[in-house]
Amino acid sequence: MFEKNTKPLICTTVKGDNADGFIAKMAELREQGTDAFLLRLEYLLPENRTEETFRKIVAGAQGYPTYATDYRRFDKYANEDDECKAEALLAAARAGVDLLDVPGNMFTNETFELTHDPIAVAKQRKLIDEIHALGKKVLMSTHVDWYLTQQEVLDIAQAQQERGADVLKIVTMSNTAKELTDNLETTRVLNETMTSSILFLSSGDMCRLHRMAGPYLGCCMWLATFEAGRKDQPLLSDLKPMLEKFENC
């Protein structure tokens, strides 16, 4: 799962403030045809961010592949430092989550999500090694709210790969037709250049085609949502039948 050169998965976001909320939503999404779950652990109430809770959530996934985040920037409680978040990722790995998201700026206060601070990079490498020792995989993520050139994307991906990431996630912008077509080409080049799996996405006014076509050019998954009104992520209930029709036409 999430391997390079294997069939891409439809991975759908799941949120909740407790295990029961996650489990109920996963049951709905299984009925709609998801292949995997993106577990947004940062939405859990602080008292529910425990290995016991994570085990309940993983059990509720019923064997479907799981990918988990604990993003500081989306944590509305904002009461955990990165050392705590590292412990949460390790607890999630012990609980059985398959793929853990390590942000590229973890262990720093930097806003750009790829630090080159040597102390922080050493901590990231150590965390990645610890997750690997538990038999799990690591995705390293870098999100920006501007357009990145192909060379900038390749440089970020190379740094993520050198730190030990199994999946290289980079999110840029597609606000014009030129940016969109550049990003499609960059997806192909990334897949041909990197040995790790890739998840290269964009947001912005013209991002939808990149999101939809990326897995046909090498991305390891489609990201879907259950929340209507998002331009950057399609509803699972729309995406699943559309892909089936496209692949059978």
Segments predicted by a language model, with ranges:
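Catalytic alpha/beta core domains of metabolic enzymes, predominantly
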Residues: 104-249
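Active-site beta->alpha loop and helix N-cap motifs at the rims of alpha/beta catalytic domains
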Residues: 2-133, 137-139, 145-150
